[in-house]
Structure formats: structure tokens, C-alpha cells
């Protein structure tokens, strides 16, 4: 006779605060927040949210958290809501505030871990709406390795100007166009008033929507939950079912790392490549994999990207936004096509307790529409929308969003700036010319600190009509909404003595996308000796912050090639 299989403990940690004589004080505290005698036998579910009133990205999370809690109650659990921070990249762009964007990812992960560990919660539903809050939540889920479900707030609807869709990126580009005399200040004002018609994250395939798509592909979100807009009441249904799902995961004994496996990360990269997603996905997936104890490296992105075509005709480079993806069936449509082509791991487990293939079989999504998302035999590009570069200027790697490139090779003359502001001043003064390579350094994870996004300068370059004629390279990052010829995440960064620290005005820089190379060449005789002379007596710029969160961050953050992690 076989031994009966033991059932998973649905209260793997909350017994520490609910069971036994010694927990009288803890139970007393819990009674004060509404728990009764019968509730102490239920699993306690943390409902962690980055809701705030600062940015439209997160406005719907308060409503969705209520629906999650109803779902937890309906499934037999007890929800306990708590909050964490979120930084709006759109508001913090182009000034000192952007130093704090990437570090917010770590603060979010650390704060969720702190609450979940301290209060002995059994599982979590984690809700987020803005760029860094999505990976921050998923990093926390992987680190804790409890039953966990991620829920996205949803994206905003596009605004309208003269019958044309506009998003927040149009505002950044309008600034450059206005400075170049191409449009009036009144036209900028019209765009400004239209770009955010309501709640939700920025609508293109920028960082938030890329990471929401990744959350679905990696199996941490319910199938079909990434694409519906924030205002769509289907999101309340997904929220309710997410609350039910986490309790079901506890009953099955399924934890985050059983879902966030090597195969799941490869699925996530595949979907990001097919959509032409944000370069920030590279940083965030590397960081998430580290928390999940998955050996993912920057080179895996090229390996997978070689096999996956770029299919999404999506902003910032394409025509469409996430709402259009929703209209054609959402991310399951993309995953089904990729699965049928043998490009995804169908046996990867998901938060439904079923595999990715089982979920897609139940949903039976329609075929690709061949406009918003191209069919595989008619791709926009034959390989994925993100490429990792190496070479003399980036020995550890750099990232380029090839989804927007027409030509595979660009060679130009270096114009070197220590920080974004100096580059913006030069552009406004008309000092940036076609075939220049704008080099912005000391903006890396440690040297920035915080690896600021360069959307203000890239938007201004495009608005000035130089988007296809000027290459911008940096040890900082780019927004998911960045367009133009841009290479970021150059590693080693300048403050660590990477080659970018020794580039000078007049050097020739070549970007060769086809061969995945980023090279620097000193012009003139004795070029090699001149390069070595530049290193003599070199010292990095002094730290900009020595106290506070950025002072601590700069001391411990690792290379962008490893995800800019801090642990």
C-alpha cells in the first residue's frame, strides 16, 4: 500500500504569528485590523501595491487591490494590504530626479521582502504600474520564493491631436522640434494637454508594457492580463482571479521559483524580442534571474534573438500601442504564434498551476493580425528587436534596440560629454551636427549614480530632425520610449575605467549592428600609444552623492552587464 501524499501547508509562515499561547500579542494586533477567530486558520496573503497619486501609471491600483482582496477572501485566504513606493520616469526625466529611478527598483524589492518576511505572510499578489515597479515586484517574488502572482495596472489610452494618436514620447520630441523652430510653443502645449488622457502607464511598447508582457510570458501573471487598458473593467476581473490564484498556488505548493525557471526566462526574452521591447528588459531580466537563482547572462539575449523575428509594429518605432495589441487578442496571440513555431517552452509552469501550452490551448487565441503584430513569415526584422554589442568600446557589453535601425553600420565623430546636461546644452546651441556620435558618460549605475535614462536628449535630437543622422552612446540607459540611433548600458562604465572614459572629441566610433560591434578608433599617428597615454594618471570623477540612498547605492551597485544589481 502506498503512503498517502501529504498536502502542502497552506500556512507555511503565518503560523508564526497565529498559533499557540505565545502568539497572543500578535493575534491581538491582528484582531485590531479585522481578523476574527475563524480567520487565524486561513493563509495570510500580502497584497503589495505601488499605488500613489503622483503619476497616472499607478492610479488604478487602489481599485484593483480591492478586487484582489475580494478574490483572496473568495478562495479562503485572508488578504493584508501594504504599500511601497514608485518613481515616475516621465516626471523625473531630464533632471536630478532621474538618478533615483533605477534605485527605486531595489527599494521596492527590498521593501516588499521586508514586509513579507517581518509579518510572516504566506503568499503575495503584487501590483504595479510604472516602469521600475514591475521588475521590483517580480524580483521580490523571486527572492522570497513564496506563492505569488503579479498584476499590472494597465496602460493608458492614446491621446488625440488633430485626429492622430499621441503618447508621452511625442511631448519629449516636441520639445526638440520647438527648439529647432519646427513647431510653435502653442503646438507643444496642445500635445502636452493630450498625451495622458487618463490613468495607466505610457501606452507604447515602452518599459512598463514590455515588462507586463514579460510577466505574462514568464508565467507570473494570469494569461491575457497584460494588454487590457487601465480603464477597462476586465482588469477588475483579472484582479479578482489573481487573488484566487495565489490561494490555489498555496494549495498546490507552487512557489515563484518553480515558475521563474530557466525556460520561463527564455520565454520572456523571446516575447520581448518579438515585440521589439524596451532595452531596459535586459537589465531587469538579468536582475530578476539573479533573484530566482537562474544563470542568465547578457549573451543569452543574442542567442535567443538570433532565432526570434521582430514582429511588433509598435511605438516608439512603429505605428501601434498596447491598446491595439489588446484589440487583436493580447499577448496570448503572440505567445501562441511563437509556441507553434517552436520558439517557446510550452511546458513552463505558470500561476494558473498549468503550463503555458495548457493555458494557450484553453484560451485558443486568434491568429496574428499581420498588422499590429506581423506574421512570422513577414517579419519587420528577421531577428529580435534587441541586440547585445561587444567591442573595444564595450568589452563587457552594450545594448542597442535594433527595432528602429534602417542601416546596420554607422561611423561618426565623437562629441564627448560628462553627463546629459552638457549634451543638451550643446544641442540647444546648434553644436551637434549630422554624423556626430554623442558620447554621454559618467551616467552608469555607479557613476551616475543610478544610470539615468537619456529620453530628454534623445527626444530633443529626434525633434531637431537629427534622429537618423546622430548616434548617441552612453553608459547610462534609455527610456523604453527612446527612438533614434542609441546604444546604452556600455560596460565597463566610465567611473570604473571602462574604455568610454578615455574617448576624446574627434575619435571615430563605429556601430556595426550586423557584427554586433561597438568600436573606437583614435585618429592620427601612434593611435595605440595615444590611447595608452590617456590612461596615465586617470582618476574617475568624484562621487556626486556620498550620503543617502544614492550614496549607499553607488558603493554596492554592480555593472549593467549583470543587471545593475545590488546584492
Curated annotation (Swiss-Prot):
GO biological process terms held by the UniProt record: isoleucine biosynthetic process; L-valine biosynthetic process
Keywords linked to the UniProt accession: 2Fe-2S, Amino-acid biosynthesis, Branched-chain amino acid biosynthesis, Iron, Iron-sulfur, Lyase, Magnesium, Metal-binding
Cofactor note: Binds 1 [2Fe-2S] cluster per subunit. This cluster acts as a Lewis acid cofactor.
GO MF annotations, alphabetized: 2 iron, 2 sulfur cluster binding; dihydroxy-acid dehydratase activity; magnesium ion binding
SUPFAM superfamilies found in the cross-reference section: IlvD/EDD N-terminal domain-like, LeuD/IlvD-like
The UniProt record lists the keyword Ribosomal protein: no
Catalysed reactions listed for this entry: (2R)-2,3-dihydroxy-3-methylbutanoate = 3-methyl-2-oxobutanoate + H2O; (2R,3R)-2,3-dihydroxy-3-methylpentanoate = (S)-3-methyl-2-oxopentanoate + H2O
Pathway where it operates: Amino-acid biosynthesis; L-isoleucine biosynthesis; L-isoleucine from 2-oxobutanoate: step 3/4; Amino-acid biosynthesis; L-valine biosynthesis; L-valine from pyruvate: step 3/4
Protein name according to UniProt: Dihydroxy-acid dehydratase
Native species: Nocardioides sp. (strain ATCC BAA-499 / JS614)
Amino acid at each position: 500500500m502506498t503512503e498517502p501524499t501529504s498536502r502542502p501547508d497552506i500556512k507555511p509562515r503565518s503560523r508564526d504569528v497565529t498559533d499557540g499561547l505565545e502568539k497572543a500579542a500578535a493575534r491581538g494586533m491582528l484582531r485590531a485590523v479585522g481578523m476574527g477567530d475563524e480567520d487565524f486558520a486561513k493563509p495570510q496573503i500580502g497584497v503589495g501595491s505601488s499605488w500613489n497619486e503622483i503619476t497616472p501609471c499607478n492610479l488604478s491600483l487602489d481599485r484593483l487591490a480591492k478586487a484582489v482582496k475580494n478574490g483572496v477572501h473568495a478562495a479562503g485566504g485572508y488578504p493584508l494590504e501594504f504599500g511601497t513606493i514608485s518613481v515616475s520616469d516621465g516626471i523625473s526625466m531630464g533632471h536630478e530626479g532621474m538618478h533615483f529611478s533605477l534605485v527605486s527598483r531595489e527599494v521596492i524589492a527590498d521593501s516588499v521582502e521586508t514586509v513579507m518576511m517581518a509579518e510572516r505572510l504566506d503568499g503575495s499578489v503584487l501590483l504595479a504600474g510604472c516602469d521600475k515597479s514591475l521588475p521590483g515586484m517580480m524580483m521580490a517574488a523571486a527572492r522570497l520564493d513564496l506563492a505569488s502572482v503579479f498584476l499590472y495596472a494597465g496602460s493608458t489610452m492614446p491621446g488625440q491631436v488633430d485626429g492622430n494618436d499621441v503618447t508621452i514620447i511625442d511631448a519629449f520630441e516636441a520639445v526638440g522640434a520647438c527648439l529647432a523652430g519646427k513647431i510653435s510653443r502653442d503646438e507643444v502645449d496642445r500635445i502636452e494637454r493630450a498625451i495622458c488622457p487618463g490613468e495607466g502607464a505610457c501606452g507604447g511598447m515602452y518599459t512598463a508594457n514590455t515588462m507586463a508582457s514579460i510577466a505574462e510570458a514568464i508565467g507570473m501573471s494570469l494569461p491575457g492580463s497584460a494588454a487590457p487598458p487601465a480603464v477597462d473593467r476586465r482588469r477588475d476581473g483579472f484582479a479578482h482571479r489573481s487573488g484566487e490564484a495565489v490561494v490555489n498556488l498555496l494549495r498546490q505548493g507552487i512557489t515563484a521559483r518553480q515558475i521563474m525557471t530557466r525556460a520561463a526566462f527564455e520565454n520572456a526574452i523571446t516575447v520581448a524580442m518579438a515585440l521589439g521591447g524596451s532595452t531596459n528588459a535586459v537589465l531587469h531580466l538579468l536582475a530578476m534571474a539573479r533573484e530566482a537563482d537562474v544563470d542568465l547572462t547578457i549573451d543569452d539575449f543574442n542567442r535567443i534573438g538570433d532565432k526570434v523575428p521582430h514582429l511588433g509594429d509598435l511605438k516608439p518605432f512603429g505605428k501601434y500601442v498596447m491598446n491595439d495589441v489588446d484589440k487583436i487578442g493580447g499577448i496570448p496571440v503572440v505567445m501562441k504564434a511563437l509556441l507553434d513555431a517552436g520558439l517557446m517552452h510550452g511546458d513552463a509552469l505558470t500561476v494558473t498551476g498549468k503550463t503555458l501550452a495548457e493555458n494557450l490551448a484553453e484560451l485558443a487565441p486568434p491568429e496574428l493580425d499581420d498588422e499590429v503584430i506581423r506574421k512570422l513569415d513577414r517579419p519587420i526584422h528577421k531577428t529580435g528587436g534587441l541586440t547585445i554589442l561587444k567591442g573595444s568600446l564595450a568589452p563587457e557589453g552594450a545594448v542597442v534596440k535594433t527595432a528602429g535601425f534602417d542601416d546596420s553600420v554607422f561611423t561618426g565623430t565623437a562629441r564627448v560629454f560628462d553627463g546629459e546636461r552638457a549634451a543638451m546644452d550643446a544641442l540647444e546651441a546648434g553644436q551637434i551636427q549630422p554624423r556626430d556620435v554623442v558620447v554621454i558618460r559618467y551616467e552608469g549605475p555607479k557613476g551616475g549614480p543610478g544610470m539615468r535614462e537619456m529620453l530628454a536628449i534623445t527626444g530633443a535630437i529626434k525633434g531637431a530632425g537629427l534622429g537618423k543622422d546622430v548616434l548617441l552612446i552612453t553608459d547610462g540607459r534609455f527610456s523604453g520610449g527612446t527612438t533614434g540611433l542609441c546604444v546604452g548600458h556600455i560596460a565597463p562604465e566610465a567611473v570604473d575605467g571602462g574604455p568610454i572614459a578615455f574617448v576624446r572629441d574627434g575619435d571615430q566610433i563605429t556601430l556595426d549592428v550586423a557584427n554586433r560591434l561597438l568600436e573606437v578608433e583614435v585618429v592620427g599617428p601612434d593611435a595605440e600609444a595615444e590611447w595608452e597615454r590617456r590612461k596615465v594618471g586617470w582618476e574617475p570623477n568624484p562621487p556626486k552623492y556620498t550620503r543617502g540612498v544614492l550614496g549607499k547605492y553607488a558603493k554596492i551597485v554592480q555593472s549593467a552587464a549583470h543587471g545593475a544589481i545590488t546584492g
